[in-house]
Amino acid sequence: MLNHGIFTFSNDAKESYDLMIKYVSDAEKAIKKLKRRKIKQIKNLNTKITPAQIAPILRGLTSNSTKSKFILTFRNNKILKYFIDGKEVSRYSTEGTATPDHVIRVKPFPLIIKPKPRSSISEFEKTAKKAFINYRKKYLHYFEQNQKKVKEKKTILDTSPRVIIVQNICLLYTSDAADE
C-alpha cells in the first residue's frame, strides 16, 4: 500500500518494533535482488500531432459523459515517455492499484490510445472516439461486476477515464478540480 506503510503487531511494543525492522529489512533485500527489466519500446510513429492539438479533442470526449467539464493536465518527461511508449503498456499499466486512493482518484485502468503512424488530427480523433467508447464499455462492465459483489447499491459517478495514455505523444490526467 504505497505511502500507507506496513503494520506489525505483537503483545508488546519492543517485539512489534523488532518485527517492523525485520520486515523492512527483508523487503530491502528482496528489492535489491530484483533485476531491472527493460521495457521494449514501440517504433517511433513519426507523428506530427502535438499534445496541444489533441487536448481539446480529449477534453471534449472526457466531458461527454458527465455534466462536469474536465481539466486536462499534460504530463511528459523522459521516464513517462519510456513508460507510455512500451509495447506492453496495456499490460503493465493495469497491474494492480497502489493504494485505495489510487482506485478512487484514477480508476482501475487508464485509457490507452494508440494512434496510427503519421495520423492526421482527424484520423486521431476517430481513433480517440473509438478508444473512449471501448473504455466506457469496459469501465461499465467493471462497475457492474463489482456491484454484484456487494449488498448495498452503488451509484456510478461517470465512465470517463482519469489517466489517458497517448502512445508516442503524452500522458494526460483528467479531473474536475484543478487541485487534484
Located regions from the model:
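A C-terminal functional module that forms or caps the active site or interfaces directly
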Residues: 104, 135-136, 140-142, 146
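Contiguous mid-protein beta-loop-alpha structural module that forms a pocket-lining wall or clamp
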Residues: 1-38
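Hard-cation-handling environments
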Residues: 31-119
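C-terminal regulatory/interaction regions
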Residues: 167-168, 175
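Divalent metal-coordination and catalytic microenvironments
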Residues: 4, 104, 169
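Conserved small/polar residues in nucleotide/adenosyl-binding loops
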Residues: 173-180
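A structural signal for short secondary-structure junctions
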Residues: 96-98, 155-159, 164-167
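Non-transmembrane, aqueous-exposed alpha-helical and coiled segments at domain scale
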Residues: 147-150, 156-158, 170
